[in-house]
Amino acid sequence: MAWLGTKRIAFVPLYRTVTQPDPPDVIPADWNGDIMRRALNDPDATTGADRSLRAYIRAASSGRADLEATVMPMVTVNRKDVRLDDADMQQLAQRMRDQGFDAAAIVMLGGPGAGTGQEGGFLARFVMREKLGTWAMELMHVLTGFTDIRCRPGFTDCEGGVRDIGNFDEMAFNGGMHPTAYTKAAIQWLDASAIANHTGRIGGYDLHPVGLNQPPPSGKVAAVRIGSQVPYLMAEARLKVDQFESPSQLEPGIPSEGVIVYRVQTTDPLGHPQNNHIPLYLLTPTALTAGQSVVSDTDIAVTVTGSAPDGFSILVENRRAPFDHGQLLSYGDNGTPGNVSDPVVVGFGGWADFTALFAGGDRIYAVDQAGQLLSYGDNGNPGNVSNPVVVGFGGWGSFRALFAGGDRIYAVDQGGRLLSYGDSGTPGNVSDPVVVGFGGWGDFRALFAGGNRIYAVVR
């Protein structure tokens, strides 16, 4: 089932004549009006923003779900405990069904802790003193069938609650914040196409925060899924972009801003736990910010490479995956004996299509199929070397050899001359070479430069 479109919800005030040893229920002067305010228009006393149930559902679903609220006449019972499976509650539910409602919420007085909902059923129960998050969670249980995904007794991997997705997901801690991208997708509030599926070794992604309206704009994704089978990782951006992700008078909002990474550990479409594992295992109790990274026990690295007011950029690297054809690898060498290994992927693909590649200083030079000379900047960090500067407008594919040293580019022309070009790294044509070798340079087996020296291997 899914909460899509507008659902008719009956809110039934329930007064208990027996509450001992708890204090007696005190009926508010305008109980019906108070319920309707909580359902449809409930300005926060601190911020003034609407934190009603309807505002939350519309925001969390990006307008896919809505509700029509009706407050029914008060019901009176002469007992303290009211359970959803009690005979009179089931009879009440049937009367609401007969009137065309999609769900009914029994609204009680007294202290918090009454919140419950029939997963995929019809009835929810909560009290007036419970916060928006509880009202939303219990009705989401009813109308989506989705379960609680918090840590529970008997789970083997909660680590004292540190790994609980907690206040990053409404369906874990009922704090009135947005659900994760995983949960939104499960209840059809987020299209699967909004979540990128990472394949191969390395890839970069621009994240659109989960709390903003979905789907994301072109070029961005709501989350990245890493892995095709359970368990798999998810990475998403969280920012305090609205009244539900931000703190309010009564609820804390999300714990931190940045990128969170969590492991999905259940195949159940409605989030039920399996094998005594928490459904969502949080790898980042504090969200990652620019420059920070996390590495999973399966050698999946997620690095935040940049931030902006409307999201984050991340780099995902599966360090156990083979390198992809056409990637550019960067190896470090400190000059000591041993194998130069553990390369960094600095070009994600397409580098095999160039007709020539060489490096000088902190620049990488490439000759494309049109004979242009491209200059790329590289600081040696993981990421995609991109956005080249065209420093040679054409004809560079005609040289017999190309190499660089410092800020000089050397080329051997068809006549065997060695030409020296200057490059400041700025856009423009590298031209007006100096002839530094008058002939015979095409006869060498290899040519390269280091510092202010040129080296040649004779045949």
Please name every model-derived segment.
Residues 1-139, 154, 206, 211, ...:
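Zn2+-dependent metallopeptidase catalytic core
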Residues 5, 163-165, 253-255:
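A short, structural micro-pattern
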Residues 15-26, 46, 119-129, 206-321:
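Non-catalytic C-terminal accessory/binding modules of secreted extracellular proteins
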Residues 16-19, 110-113, 149, 176-177, ...:
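Acidic glycine-/aspartate-rich tracts in secreted/extracellular proteins
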Residues 27-53, 261-265, 332-352:
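Short, flexible N-terminal segments of the mature chain
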Residues 103, 108-249:
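Extracellular hydrolytic enzyme modules, especially secreted metalloproteases
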Residues 320-459:
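Trp/Gly-enriched beta-strand/coil motifs that build multi-repeat beta-propeller-like domains
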